[in-house]
């Protein structure tokens, strides 16, 4: 072996992809030390010449954004359109551990490079396909992209002002989300296949990934509360005017709203039940904004952030490509680093106490395959690509979304899991139902979706007895996961030093909002805060309107990066025998998805902003009113062939230039769409080969023919909510779903079972209940 040892040293990856999603999977693996060879046509990845800001790329050079996504890889040119091209590709596949492929299923079949074709050459290889709908099902061959999929999953429909044109999320966030889910799925299968010699097809669907990330498991409402359907909305407070700029504010919990109202001098708003919900504030937005702005406009951003932080209200500055690298927190932590090809970008979002990631390296020129590394055998983990973590024990101390979702994903890969939750202060996601029910804490789709199949024990960790039980659980855990602000684990004594002393083999994942050190260390923050501060909101909204929030994708995005980190640490433990600390801050995951803004600003001096529903990569693209009241149709044209298909369907487009006549095209499409029923026009456009979708409400996004065919919803009987649909993770392994294992647990459901497994007898468990150390009912709520 030559060169330094990284977690994936010895893993050989063939990347057959362009644009963002597949290359970002390859980037994550290359950052961890894998040898990633990018297969390109003679023309090269189109992103070699792509700049979202329209910057001129010098002849013979490559775009900075391409270089960010492809640093550290090799490049091989294969022309699949000529005789012998397929044989060249299959020769490369024969030496690979993993193939990442984003070819459309129809193209893969026509070229003879389906997963089955590739595995026939190399039965030990894992083929991870990453396509809009997956490679199976009635929609597998339909054209779609990030914009269209946002409409299909219900994200677009509910973002913006009621009665006005809704708005999609900008900045390719759906592509990043799909990549984030595909990476740990492909990596875990590859590590197991290398041990067993049996490969697999990991069939990833961007549609399913965005169901997870761009809504909060909303189809559950159809069974839990069929009459509850929230309107188009935006958060209040959110991005608000200060005296010297814009400030980011976020109130998710009732306590945060009451504290915010006290801060701005409007305590009566905090006491009014009308304003406890986002919807209530939106209904009286002018009145609420008047009070908010009277405070914010009288203070600077720094002044507001200082006092809001003291109140434990999520807050921060509003970031963009120019400002992000200069924030003191990122400077002190070394978040933004120089790229060897002349720009800056964020470092990888995960850090290790023992493992070493690969250094920043240049992207290859077209066809620069370099020298194949001689890296030795490489890591292994498990033996079954569908259950590579069988036998691994996870202790889930997480709350809300990012930590619990990372733990849930790893459990579905075969791990045993125990979730610890306090009955004194419940996981905050339990209170996010949005409607009133008896046993309200059992009715939140957000909690259900993040915690299916988990074994749950309740413990008050502020007590000595609770700490003693936790210590026993720590002694046998392979992985410990938490995502509180650092001070919480410090107060419970669950520091890295303490965990390591008890259990040197433990992998301890910590995923706080802003990291374990730095000026913002103790600030609280949700996914929406990361979107505001980290630049994602800067790409979302109409050009002449307020910046809006993606509203949640960062949690899932960060959770999947955390899952990758745990897999890397477990694989390293197979080699070293010891565990380690992982730091995976929520904000640094968000910065990966907004990295294009920093790259464009540092490379070309251009600041990216909001385009509304238009796109620099697709034209025409927009939302168009249908014949139905306030219902919209999404259309996005990326190729000349798709434009020709649209011209063949809609009269009046023949003499228009798709790049130069955007306004006139919008007029023609708008007039056509207003005469159409949404579902019918969607079907007509799809049949004509045009990427399009009717904007659905997220509550109604689950019952599609594609989801039914691929078994996306897994139904389980919950003790309180009854028959409940849960989202599968967005991939199939050799055509099969990974089982979620059951419904989300009720509060304290498995406490006796867990305590008995630790050796406590019936009398000892009864004493813990009498002392209030454990319970199956929330403290402070009267029992019926």
Residue ranges and their predicted role:
Residues 271-281, 319-328, 343, 656-669, ...:
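Short linear loop/turn motifs
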Residues 1-198, 221-222, 291, 302, ...:
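N-terminal helix-loop segment corresponding to the beta1-alpha1 unit
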Residues 189-228, 317, 321, 569-612, ...:
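Substrate-binding/catalytic subdomain of NAD(P)-dependent oxidoreductase enzymes
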């Amino acid at each position: 072996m030559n060169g330094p040892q990284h977690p994936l040293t010895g893993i050989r990856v063939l990347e057959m992809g362009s644009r963002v999603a597949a290359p970002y999977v390859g980037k994550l693996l290359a950052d961890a030390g894998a040898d990633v060879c990018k297969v390109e046509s003679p023309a090269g990845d189109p992103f070699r010449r792509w700049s979202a800001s329209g910057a001129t790329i010098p002849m013979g050079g490559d775009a900075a954004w391409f270089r960010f996504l492809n640093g550290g890889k090799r490049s091989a040119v294969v022309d699949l359109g000529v005789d012998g091209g397929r044989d060249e590709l299959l020769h490369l596949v024969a030496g690979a551990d993993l193939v990442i492929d984003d070819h459309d299923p129809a193209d893969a079949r026509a070229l003879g490079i389906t997963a089955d074709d590739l595995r026939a050459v190399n039965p030990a290889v894992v083929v991870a396909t990453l396509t809009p709908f997956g490679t199976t099902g009635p929609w597998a061959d339909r054209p779609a992209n990030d914009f269209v999929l946002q409409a299909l999953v219900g994200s677009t429909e509910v973002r913006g002002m009621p009665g006005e044109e809704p708005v999609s999320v900008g900045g390719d966030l759906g592509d990043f989300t799909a990549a984030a889910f595909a990476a740990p799925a492909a990596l875990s299968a590859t590590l197991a296949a290398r041990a067993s010699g049996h490969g697999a097809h990991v069939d990833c669907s961007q549609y399913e990934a965005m169901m997870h990330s761009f809504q909060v498991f909303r189809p559950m409402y159809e069974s839990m509360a069929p009459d509850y359907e929230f309107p188009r909305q935006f958060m209040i407070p959110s991005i608000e005017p200060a005296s010297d700029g814009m400030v980011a504010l976020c109130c998710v919990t009732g306590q945060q709203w009451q504290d915010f109202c006290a801060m701005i001098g409007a305590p009566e708003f905090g006491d009014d039940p009308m304003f406890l919900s986002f919807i209530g504030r939106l209904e009286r937005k002018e009145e609420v904004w008047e009070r908010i702005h009277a405070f914010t406009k009288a203070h600077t951003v720094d002044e507001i952030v200082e006092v809001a932080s003291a109140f434990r209200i999520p807050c921060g500055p509003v970031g963009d490509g120019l400002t992000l690298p200069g924030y003191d927190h990122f400077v002190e932590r070394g978040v933004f680093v120089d790229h060897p090809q002349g720009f800056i970008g964020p470092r990888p979002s995960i850090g290790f106490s023992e493992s070493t990631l690969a250094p920043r390296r240049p992207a290859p020129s077209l066809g620069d395959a370099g020298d194949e590394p001689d890296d030795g055998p490489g890591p292994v983990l498990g033996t079954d690509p569908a259950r590579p973590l069988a036998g691994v024990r996870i202790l889930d101390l997480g709350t809300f979304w990012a930590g619990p979702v990372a733990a849930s994903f790893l459990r579905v890969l075969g791990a045993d899991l125990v979730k610890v939750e306090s009955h004194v202060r419940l996981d905050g996601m339990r209170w996010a139902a949005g409607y009133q029910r008896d046993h309200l804490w059992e009715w939140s789709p957000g909690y259900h979706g993040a915690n299916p199949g988990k074994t749950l024990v309740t413990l008050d960790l502020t007590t000595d007895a609770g700490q003693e039980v936790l210590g026993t659980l720590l002694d046998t855990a392979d992985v410990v996961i938490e995502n509180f602000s650092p001070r919480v684990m410090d107060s419970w004594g669950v520091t890295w030093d303490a965990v390591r002393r008890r259990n040197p083999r433990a992998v301890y994942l910590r995923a706080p909002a802003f990291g374990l050190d730095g000026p913002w260390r103790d600030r609280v923050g949700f996914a929406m805060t990361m979107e505001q501060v980290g630049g994602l909101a800067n790409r979302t909204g109409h050009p002449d309107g307020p910046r809006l929030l993606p509203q949640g994708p960062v949690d899932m995005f960060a959770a999947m990066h955390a899952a990758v980190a745990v897999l890397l640490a477990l694989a390293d433990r197979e080699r070293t025998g010891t565990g380690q600390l992982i730091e995976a801050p929520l904000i640094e995951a968000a910065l990966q998805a907004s990295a294009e803004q920093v790259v464009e600003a540092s490379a070309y001096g251009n600041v990216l902003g909001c385009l509304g529903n238009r796109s620099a990569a697709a034209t025409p693209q927009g939302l168009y009113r249908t014949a139905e009241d306030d219902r919209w149709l999404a259309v996005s044209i990326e190729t000349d062939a798709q434009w020709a298909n649209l011209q063949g369907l809609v009269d009046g487009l023949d003499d228009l230039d798709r790049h130069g006549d955007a306004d006139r095209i919008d007029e023609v499409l708008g007039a056509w769409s207003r005469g159409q029923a949404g579902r019918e026009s969607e079907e007509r456009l799809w049949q004509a080969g045009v990427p399009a979708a009717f904007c659905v409400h997220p509550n109604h996004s689950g019952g599609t023919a594609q989801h039914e065919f691929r078994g996306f919803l897994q139904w389980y009987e919950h003790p309180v909510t009854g028959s409940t649909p849960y989202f599968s993770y967005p991939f199939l392994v050799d055509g099969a779903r990974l089982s979620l294992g059951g419904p989300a647990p009720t509060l304290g459901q498995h406490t006796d079972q867990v305590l008995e497994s630790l050796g406590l007898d019936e009398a000892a468990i009864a004493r813990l209940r009498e002392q209030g150390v454990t319970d199956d009912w929330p403290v402070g709520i009267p029992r019926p």
